[in-house]
Structures are given as C-alpha cells and as structure tokens.
C-alpha cells in the first residue's frame, strides 16, 4: 500500500508543515510506504500551457506529469494538505491538478457522457482556514467548497471516498489547540490507512 501526500504551502515554519509532519509520522508508524510531493520545494510549474493542452489531446504527456500520474495510480490513500486561499486551492496546487488530472488519465468522455477513471482510492484533505468553521457554515461556504473542491473535482474523476477536515482560526488558536489538531490529524490518518487496507 502506498500513501501519497500532496503538500502546498511555501513556509516550512507554517502550521501546515506541522500537519504534514504529523501525517507522515502517522503513516510511518503503520509501516506504510509514504511519498511526499512538496510542490513548492519541487518548484512545480503550475502553468498549463496551450502547447501542453494540444499535446495531451494527442496523448502526449510530459514525463514529469506522467510521473505524478503514476504516483496517483499507485496510491491507495491520497492526502492533500493546504491552506484555503481566496476560497480555493493555492495556485500551485490548482495548477498541479490542472496539469496532472488529464483527459484519458483522470476521466474520459464517451456516448454516455464523462466517466471518472481514478478508482479504488480514498482521499483525505487537511485544510487550514483563517476564519472559524462555524462562520463558513453560517455563510454556506462549506457547502460551496464541498460542491466545488470535492464533488465537482475529485468525484468527477472517480474518487468517490473523499474526506476533508477544516482547521479554523489557525492564526488565533493557542499551542494547546494546535497540539489537539495535530493529534486529530494523526488519528484521522491512521484510521483512513487502516480502513483502506
């Protein structure tokens, strides 16, 4: 079993990085092969060019994108760790998904419509937000995010079992609350790995 972690935060001192470390620790504790794709550290190019779009239409995929697709294919659990910026993914993660989830790999179109091609995976997302979660729920943002970032993207590609956890007020909480979040991250990760065997 392989656990793929896709991480998108530029600051190695951030709380997102602590979440990453806790997720890796939980995976290692269970002896699971773990691969981390730190998009900023990799200097991943998030720009999907028109040339790349045209080439993909002919089945020509850049080797670095084929590598990312192979990791997704091999993984049983995929973890995304990122801050919610302006109601969406950080640009580098959005670009990663634009470039990697290509037609023919993530989905296809036939006479019945669009069919997702990425099956038998579980995804967990750890998302930090600047506001509190109750405020997002009150404004309906949680439903919008669920519709766009989960149903509208990953379910579309065939990943049906998508779980997400928001961690709010991230700049206001104290050390005790941060430790409680990290403990929760470890528990969720271990549970998703055990359930996925």
Predicted regions and their residues:
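Short, structured loop/turn "capping" segments at alpha-beta junctions
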Residues: 103, 107, 159-162
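N-terminal beta1-alpha1-beta2 submodule of the flavodoxin-like/Rossmannoid cofactor-binding fold
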Residues: 1-105, 172, 176-197
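Structured loop/turn residues at beta-strand edges in well-structured enzyme cores
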Residues: 73, 91, 118-121, 160
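Conserved beta-strand scaffold positions in the cores of enzyme catalytic domains, especially
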Residues: 5, 34-36, 125, 161-164
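A structural micro-motif
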Residues: 1, 32, 121, 159-160
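Short, glycine-/small-residue-rich phosphate/pyrophosphate-handling segment
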Residues: 108-156
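A short small-residue
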Residues: 1-3, 128-131, 162-170
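Glycine-rich phosphate/pyrophosphate-binding loop and the adjoining helix
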Residues: 139-197
